[in-house]
């Protein structure tokens, strides 16, 4: 949909959020999300297919949990902050796998930039306050939030992040 991509370039982040909230057509919404994330992170749609929900979510207003890789809506299974934490961890681990592959190929700097851009995108869209809220959602979620913060403040090649 080239016309949709042209429209994306003209919209601000707030305008994109408004379009997404008002749209009831999943294919259009998914295209908008993919276009937005592709522009912001310079990834291809295949890199982010089902994981894009977290990047346009926050603790108060998360979107399309049913678009995640889980069969049932996380909204029905968890309080919103637990769902957010689980989605964030799933997304981050998926990108971390790719970064580990880059490291194994000797692409250390590329891996570090790749994973940091994802971590910063997560922080940008859910906010520092939401990272704090994630810590209240149980031991695993708290560990994830601590490690995300540690990664963002680290100068180590991969930030010392440990997959769970």
Question: How should each PLM-predicted stretch be described?
Answer:
Residues 1-7, 14, 18-21, 25-164:
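Eukaryote-biased, non-catalytic alpha-solenoid scaffold regions
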């Amino acid at each position: 949909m080239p016309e949709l991509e042209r429209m994306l370039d003209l919209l601000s982040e707030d305008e994109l959020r408004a379009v997404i909230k008002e749209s009831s057509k999943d294919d259009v919404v998914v295209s908008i999300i993919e276009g937005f994330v592709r522009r912001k992170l310079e990834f291809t749609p295949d890199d982010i297919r089902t994981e894009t929900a977290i990047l346009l979510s926050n603790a108060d207003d998360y979107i399309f949990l049913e678009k995640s890789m889980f069969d049932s809506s996380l909204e029905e299974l968890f309080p919103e902050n637990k769902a957010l934490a689980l989605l964030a961890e799933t997304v981050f681990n998926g990108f971390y796998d790719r970064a580990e592959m880059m490291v194994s190929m000797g692409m250390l700097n590329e891996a570090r930039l790749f994973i940091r851009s994802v971590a910063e995108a997560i922080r940008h869209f859910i906010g520092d306050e939401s990272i704090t809220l994630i810590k209240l959602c149980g031991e695993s979620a708290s560990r994830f939030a601590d490690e995300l913060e540690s990664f963002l403040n680290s100068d180590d090649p991969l930030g010392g992040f440990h997959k769970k």
